[in-house]
Amino acid sequence: MIVAMGELILLRHGETEWSRTGRHTGLTDVPLTPAGEAAAAALAPAIAGRDIRCACASPLQRAARTAALAGLTDVKQDPGLREWDDGGYEGLTTPQIREQRPGWYLWRDGVIPGGPGYPGETAEQVGARADDVLTRVTPLLADGDVVLVSHGHFLRVLTARWLRLGPSEGRMFRLGTGTVCTLGTEHGEPVITSWNVPPC
């Protein structure tokens, strides 16, 4: 049972040039596009008036900038919120990867090691990071809301783990850029209260 008065608010960063063109973006620190900055700023009403106990963001600039544009203050940088390391598939599109591995699917087949700084991660490794984040922030929900500003694949894995599903079950939760989701409880059990909501 989870004792929570607040909700876990998830913000996915705004659009980047790589996300716009379908390139797998793990640890490469790409900036928001102008459209991404506008979408990030438009997230502000979704969190205005919330009783925010804590706000944390991935240290990658696309997430940190989204947090700032959404009006969050006193944001803690949390390396645990970084995106899934795409390893040797960093910067490639799914069609490009499938030229090498026909039928490839991230959630089933994973990634290959890349160059220095891009060793790649398995779904289980990303799930372990998500578990660590949840272990640290869930107690704070007893006093109010917690905002996490992060990345598409990581937030999908985190949501699966919140629901006590395996990390790869994150494949079921499609998530666009510049969107807000909320995770909460019902009768002490974890639920999704809203998902993939675009800015107003």
Feature roles, as predicted:
Residues 16, 154-155:
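Short active-site segment of divalent metal-dependent hydrolases/proteases
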Residues 2-6, 86-96, 139-145, 160-200:
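Acidic, low-complexity terminal tails and accessory targeting/binding regions
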Residues 151:
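Short basic (Lys/Arg) and small-residue
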Residues 31, 73-80, 166-174:
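Short hydrophobic/aromatic-enriched beta-strand-loop microsegments
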Residues 2-3, 42-105:
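Phosphate-coordination/substrate-recognition cap region in phosphate-metabolizing enzymes
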Residues 104-108, 112-141:
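Internal catalytic-core helix/loop-beta-alpha segment
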Residues 8-66, 116-131:
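Loop-to-helix element that buttresses phosphate recognition and phosphoryl-transfer chemistry
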Residues 69, 157, 161:
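Active-site signature of alpha/beta-hydrolase-fold catalytic machinery across serine-
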